[in-house]
Amino acid sequence: MSMKKTAAVEDKKISLDKESYIKSVQERIAKIPISNYRNFSIVAHVDHGKSTLSDRLLELTGVIQPGDANKQVLDKLDVERERGITVKAQTCSMFYVDPKSKEEYLLHLVDTPGHVDFRAEVSRSYASCGGALLLIDASQGVQAQTVANFYLAYSMGLKLIPVINKIDLDAADIPRAMDQVETTFELPREDCIPVSAKTGLNIENIIPAIIRDIPGPRGSVDKPLKALLVDSWHDPYVGVVMLIHVVDGVVKKGMKLLSAHSEKRYDVKEVGIMYPDKMPMDCVKAGQVAYIIPGMRNPREAMIGDTFYQYGKHEGLEPLPGFEEPKPMVFVGAFPADGGEFKVMNDHMENLVLNDRSVTLEKETSNALGLGWRLGFLGSLHASVFKERLENEYGAKIILTAPTVPYKLIFKDGEESIVTNPDEFPGADFRNHNIEMLMEPYVNALMTIPDEYIGTVMSLCENNRGIQKELEYLTTGQVLLKYEIPLAQLVEDFFGKLKGCTKGYASLDYEDAGYKKSDIVKMELCVNGEPQDALTQVMHRSQVLSRGKEYVTRFKEYLKFQLFEVAIQAKVNNKVVARETIKAKRKDVTQKLHAADISRRKKLLSRQKEGKKQMKATGKISINQEAYQAFLRRAD
């Protein structure tokens, strides 16, 4: 038999084996009643072992084989694996047979992001679950994100099972972690399950606890279809893939769906479960967390928290609660390091935005840096992850301006306006705009720190215009601090400073606290009177003198000498608040003259002096992009 025929036979055999396997999985699901479904999530602080625990559960239920090749299975993005964080919500179905009753259960693990920037994805993931594992590092104890995510899960009615992880470490303090669970969350210490996700120790105790304590979904296959959109991503071959929680009814291939938010219709091209990758099914039913391919080409139509109905059977149905559009809170200007690569970079940007509908993208032009974009993100980590993905996946080099936050202008006639670009913020003509009030966004920052650093951290918060709201002593030397802080201060590497003054032992989480009236102004960096738009910043008036001095001193380092004097000024409302001067580069016009030719020497020096005056009045400073790049990189 020829090699081609052999290969064709093998392909056919693999295809038949795959079809047979999928059919057996479908038959297995069909036999499991909805009362034996369990949908759960894992609540954890960054780096407490959530993705590793997910891997162990998938191994225990036979979804994946043990081994290094299957590390962090649910973290699909390179940046997720590198940073050890989860950015996109993922899911996986698992089968489990109770060794005593011999009953089979269908488990859906929804792996959620832990960081505050991705709170919308976290809350929608929780909405598809009946309970969650509250994961705590035995060596670090309860941290800020554990507390914040606990309250979010608790407020949504989830049943929480405390799991103490990393008990294999020498620094593990299991009694302390149990005490913190009892005092901070008011959960019985007897409910705590001590495990090591790394070694697999005691992992087998988790699933029986999930089956016993977490309630099954309450939906019905006989009711009209209602499905909650948990997450989505863009596939270059099939378009948008949506991760859904089927609350009621059944979703089948070929069914017409209707979005409650946009009222657009879609045809289901494919439906299936994640096991751990996409596995097509004939249908998915109430209680399941599954994927569908709806023939959607524009990912921005897939809004997290949206409800989908079956078209034609949607009359009188109410959408599921909790829908909210993502709201960018941090904005940056982005420019290609090489201006000639704008078109190519624009394609890369648009491709990345396809997979992240929470990023806003608008083209903008800078006098200093040329063509670029104004990008809106959920937070600073979100911006950093986006930049890393751009560099890792496309090899793109990009310049980011200093992050800014959305400021609110309240006009005398009651109208409101949001400003996200510092260059568009009102300056000296503030009153001419009929502006009644300026407001900036605040956040409630939640920090856990060792008590020995409490004085240092409180000083840091107060220096960043923070207002203390709460102070609570946890067990064994840990303190929980709550401060109200302007978001603008938080995005300026507040977390880096917090880590620095606590030797890395602090943790931080925050939530939106709305807008407050503030004395904020626009500071422009001018070179010989010309404002440099890429370097314009908005700040509180109390920071103007120190920031102004810092900026002009630093920018002076990156400017080349000119043949005439150059003034670098920081201006607020057309008033100079700081200045540095680059002295004129001296050119010896008398070097060829005889020492005795005094009148000729005077004439040449006088002409040079007049020429420098004229150059200063009419000459333009040539500032190369490297100067801007170096300044912004250091500012970043």
Curated annotation (Swiss-Prot):
Record's GO cellular component terms: mitochondrial inner membrane; mitochondrial matrix
Domain of life: Eukaryota
Residue stretches making up the tr-type G domain: 35-218
Intracellular or extracellular location(s): Mitochondrion inner membrane
Residues that coordinate or bind GTP: 44-51, 111-115, 165-168
Top-level EC class as recorded in UniProt: hydrolase
Pfam families in the record: EFG_C, GTP_EFTU, GTP_EFTU_D2, LepA_C
Keyword annotations of the record: GTP-binding, Hydrolase, Membrane, Mitochondrion, Mitochondrion inner membrane, Nucleotide-binding, Protein biosynthesis
Keyword Zinc-finger: no
Enzyme Commission number(s) from the entry: 3.6.5.-
InterPro entries: EF-4, EFG_III/V, EFG_V-like, EFTu-like_2, G_TR_CS, LepA_C_sf, LepA_CTD, LepA_IV
Membrane topology: Peripheral membrane protein
The UniProt record lists the keyword Mitochondrion: yes
Location (main, coarse): mitochondrion
Gene Ontology biological process terms in this record: positive regulation of translation; translation
Catalytic activity: GTP + H2O = GDP + phosphate + H(+)
GO molecular-function terms, A-Z: GTP binding; GTPase activity; mitochondrial ribosome binding
NCBIfam families documented for this protein: lepA, small_GTP
Note: This protein may be expected to contain an N-terminal transit peptide but none has been predicted.
Family affiliation: Belongs to the TRAFAC class translation factor GTPase superfamily. Classic translation factor GTPase family. LepA subfamily.
Function: Promotes mitochondrial protein synthesis. May act as a fidelity factor of the translation reaction, by catalyzing a one-codon backward translocation of tRNAs on improperly translocated ribosomes. Binds to mitochondrial ribosomes in a GTP-dependent manner.
Protein name: Translation factor GUF1, mitochondrial
